[in-house]
Amino acid sequence: MTPGPTVTVNGRTYRCPRDPVVIVCIDGSEPAYFDAAIAAGRSPAIARFRRSGFATLARSVVPSFTNPNNLSIVTGVSPAVHGIAGNYFYDAAGAREVMMNDPQFLRCETLLAVLAREGAGVVVITAKDKLRRLLGHGLRGVCFSSEKAAEATKEEHGIDRVTDLVAMPVPDVYSAELSEYVLAAGLALFERERPDVMYLSLTDYIQHKHPPGDPVANEFYAMLDHYFDAFDRGGAILGITADHGMNAKSRADGTPNVVYLTPLVESMVGSGQARVILPITDPYVVHHGALGSFATIHLSRADDASRVIARLAATPGVAEVYDGPTGCARFELPADRLGDVIVVSERDVVLGKAPEAHDLSLLREPLRSHGGVSEQTVPFVLNRALVSGTRAGTDLRNFDIFDYALNRVA
């Protein structure tokens, strides 16, 4: 792409890339994972970027889930603008609960689509296919998932024969290799085609199972570091962030530490008079059992909200509770896609519907999950230093990463 021009997307202006830009979103990467891997000598590239590049912490979007944060990263704005408020929501107009994976729910363009329209070569690779259609909306470029790499076609994905790129089989969706496949395919395309912009989004399989410092987690971060080093040495401007963090959410006996909202609320408003929505819900329940730290409640009678809020505010394990408009203003969310009440749990607690609504038999380890303010802090790393005289923002968001990679690095 010819250096020099700029594009303006969703009110933000970006320089078109002069060097290849690679942005990696490490799903579920609590900052302590990098700290532990560096301390164990497993992440020398990240240690190098901390010394000679730029490294700090940033806030992700709350609810701290995959879809809202990935879409914020590629649009540069909050869910109040782009409209993707969770992985799952209640469509009041259609009176149905739906996955928020369809591009019809996206309310603005992505930076990736605009750059491609202006002539940039753009590559998007996701681990899970659930994100692919959202991230690739309006994109003239390459966009595929490692989950369904064998099914990629030029017509739909901008590329075929993806499996020829990587000397490993297409991984199981519940595996660390699903993320490695993203990076391996990304590096192969980077070396072969040197696209102007790449967005590589991983999966949090490891983070749901292994805490920071665990040998398995350190091994995973060593693998990531290998690819970060390769992109850096290949001349890329590399930006690394996460969609959310991750915390332990279990009791001492290993069982999930859950506040079940449906029986609690229905004891006040009556059976069938409240609909609890858990925006963490997605097809990958082995990770979390659809238990996260953010919930929204639709009430048959909106004037019940004040007493429901008062009751929940006094409930152990609940950190914050708001009426819908107040919660949406607090977290920059689209008010028409949240309920009458918004609930956020404490760091070590998750929110559920009712016990019978969650099949926890698939959880093989003590629950680690996300969704709340306690999982909002994420890494924000660039392999290059900021331009001399550039001051870092005092309240960085993970969705500032493209701004920094395109506009602010030396």
Regions found by a protein language model. Name each.
Residues 1-54:
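Active-site-proximal N-terminal segment of extracellular/periplasmic enzymes that hydrolyze or transfer
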Residues 19, 26, 64-65, 89-103, ...:
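Secreted, luminal/periplasmic, and some membrane-associated catalytic domains
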Residues 35-76, 123:
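Short, structured active-site-proximal loop/turn typified by the sulfatase FGly-forming signature C/S-X-P-X-R
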Residues 345-407:
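Low-complexity, glycine/alanine/valine/leucine- and proline-rich hydrophobic stretches
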